[in-house]
Swiss-Prot record:
It is found in: Secreted. GO terms for cellular component: extracellular region. Keywords: Antimicrobial, Disulfide bond, Fungicide, Plant defense, Secreted, Signal. Belongs to the DEFL family. This is Putative defensin-like protein 67. One of its GO terms (biological process) is defense response to fungus. Residues 1-24 form the signal peptide. InterPro entries: Defensin-like_dom. Disulfide bonds join 38-82, 42-65, 51-80, 55-81. Its main location: secreted. It comes from Arabidopsis thaliana (Mouse-ear cress).
């Protein structure tokens, strides 16, 4: 009877250890560097400082307004890009 309790305890401890390792690996993946992304257009009211705040809220280090050249029917626009 005592050996079966010991075996169950060892199995439970092993399962908890494995699940903690899996959780730490999953958490490590979620905090890896995010790929660059571009968000809203930069305007007279939304410029580099606002863009930087916007990107920081999305867990990026910084954000800048970058000029995007559109296809011939479109004009060039400033876009807030995070990196």
């Amino acid at each position: 009877m005592g050996s079966s309790k010991l075996m169950v305890t060892c199995i439970v401890v092993a399962m908890l250890t494995i699940s903690c390792d899996i959780l730490s690996v999953e958490m490590g993946i979620s905090v890896q560097a995010l790929p660059p992304t571009c968000g809203p257009d930069c305007t007279g009211r939304f410029m580099n400082q606002d863009c930087s705040k916007y990107c920081a809220a999305l867990s990026y280090k910084h954000g800048v307004c970058i000029l995007f050249r559109g296809l011939p029917p479109r004009t060039s626009t400033l876009r807030c890009c995070c990196g």
